[in-house]
Amino acid sequence: NRLGPPVTEHGMIFPGQLLVIPRVVTQRGRTIYVVKPGDTLYSIAVRYSTHADLLAGINPGLQNPSLIYPGQQLLIPALIYEVTSGDSLYSIANRLGVPLTVITQANQGRPAFSSNLIWPGYRLIIPLPSTQNIAVLDPYPGTVIRSGQRLHGTARAFEGNVLHQVFDSNGVVVSGERSTTTSAGAPSYGEFTTTLPFDREPTSSFGNVWVYTRSAKDGSMQDVVRLKVYFSR
């Protein structure tokens, strides 16, 4: 929680202020959020561009999703990005493939955050791409990947089946459709971990990892999560 203009009193905080716990990432791709007065699971989900069902699913200790209280710690699917020299919100959004509006909304109201000015060392909360039923926690958006890259996340899927592919920016299928299985099937959320073997060399410097399920009725893609990545040369 680096403090700077317009916040000048480092020892002063106020009710309702949003702070990030120093232990920002307890598990890869999950950041601790401290509930403040007036919060609901839905409002937290909206702020971080995710879904209340998913938040409940990645917080198994949450006995009643309709009842959360100030001071409670919840995991949210997000990473902490430290601004470096030359960064702007636009360049960060473009590099990570995360909409600028999503980044701005997640950080609005934090100490010294301004959508017009950021400086080296400031830490931004970056929501990870997710749908109601899938969150990809590794790799992060903007990661440089190669064949064998680890893929890890959380999903609520029929019979626990999750599928994935990798495309480059020219539409070439770098890693064809493969499946993996979650640790629990729907209606529960389960963890999945697998790798992304390349079937052919990318023809461009960047592309997308797709993670999704297929409809049991017609086989169509559902809950598609698209994650921007770069390819190792």
Label the model's feature ranges.
Residues 8-12, 31, 64, 79, ...:
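Short, conserved secondary-structure segments in the cores of folded domains
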Residues 17, 23-51, 69-97:
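Primarily a LysM-type cell-wall glycan-binding module
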Residues 24-26, 38, 60, 73, ...:
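Solvent-exposed coil/turn segments that connect beta secondary-structure elements
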Residues 134-136, 141-233:
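Ser/Thr-rich low-complexity repeats and stalk/linker segments
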Residues 15, 37, 64, 85, ...:
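Surface-exposed loops/turns
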Residues 1-9, 56-64, 104-114:
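Short acidic beta-strand-loop surface patches of small beta-rich interaction domains
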Residues 46-52, 94-97, 111, 120-122, ...:
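Cell-envelope/ECM-targeting effectors and their regulatory/trafficking segments
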